[in-house]
Amino acid sequence: MILNLFISKKQYTASLAKKRLKTLIKKKKKFFYQSSYLPQLKNDLLLVIAKYIKIQPNKMSIQIEKRKKNLLILEINITNVK
């Protein structure tokens, strides 16, 4: 009976560690997509959008989220548009 307490705790700990590792890998992948080309993408989009709307570079934010294996969601937020 005492042995069961230790075994179940190990299984719980292993399960928890596995969940944490999956979360860490998921966040790292998300960070990679956001960090690798995001600054250049933001600059390029700013130039294109500035042709049509007067905006300040610091008022624009871009988020990229990977939803599926071959699907990225691009979200652009612009505040104080004039």
Curated annotation (Swiss-Prot):
InterPro entries assigned to the protein according to its UniProt record, in alphabetical order: MinE, MinE_sf
Keyword Transit peptide set for record? no
- Which BP terms in the Gene Ontology apply to this protein? cell division; regulation of division septum assembly
Which keywords annotate this record? Cell cycle, Cell division
Would the keyword Cytoplasm be found if you checked this record's keyword annotation?
Answer: no
What domain of life does the native source organism fall in? Bacteria
- Function statement: Prevents the cell division inhibition by proteins MinC and MinD at internal division sites while permitting inhibition at polar sites. This ensures cell division at the proper site by restricting the formation of a division septum at the midpoint of the long axis of the cell.
**HAMAP family linked to this entry:** MinE
Family stated for the protein in its record: Belongs to the MinE family.
The protein's name: Cell division topological specificity factor
Q: Which organism is it from?
A: Buchnera aphidicola subsp. Cinara cedri (strain Cc)
Lineage of origin: Bacteria, Pseudomonadati, Pseudomonadota, Gammaproteobacteria, Enterobacterales
